[in-house]
Amino acid sequence: KTGGLAQYGLDYAALSALNPRLVYCSITGFGQSGPYAYRAGYDFLIQGMGGLMSVTGRPDGEDGGGPMKVGVALTDILTGLYASTAILAALQAREHTGRGQHIDLALLDVGVACLANQGMNYLYGGKVPQRMGNAHPNTVPYQDFPTADGHMILAVGNDGQFARLCHAAGQPGWAQDARFATNAARIAHRDALIPLIREVTATRTTRDW
């Protein structure tokens, strides 16, 4: 939270007065100003408040459905990466201006920023992002599937790859089916295609596939 270092004379205002070339990065939960500035920020809280948990986990209504945090402290890690980039940019700017900067970096800012593609999906398609488990909103099939002895991941990024999947699965007719021939069609008919693929993948072991 903000303000903790000022009591020791280690805030940016005090230190930059001694060294105007100082590049100083403050990482807090909610930034240097605003109603939450003096609140502590934890990765778990930020994943919820920033929206990451709204798109992570199984869909509502399924067994195990509901909000789920990512398995690592992702917001903490990404904030560190954002900080390193910002510091390098400030150092480069100092080469031209001779002055340092105070970088105000909030966990919540980063948590929201990493959902930029979800915002783009909404602006483009008008659909509010939802939890989809391991599925992908814009690509089908792109998720986990059962095998005879476990699970595997299929990440089919284009129609050519889908045709090759159909051949490998012994189902060439899928690629000719108008419901599945293009990615746009597969998205529209996801509920019909995914059960068909699951039936086939479950017949062989992961190694066989």
Identify the residue ranges that each predicted region occupies.
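Short acidic, glycine-rich surface-loop motifs adjacent to enzyme active sites
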Residues: K1-G4
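Active-site-adjacent "lid/gating" segments in soluble enzymes
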Residues: A6-M152, V156-G157, A163
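Aromatic-enriched alpha-helical interface/lid elements that frame and gate functional surfaces
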Residues: V140-W209
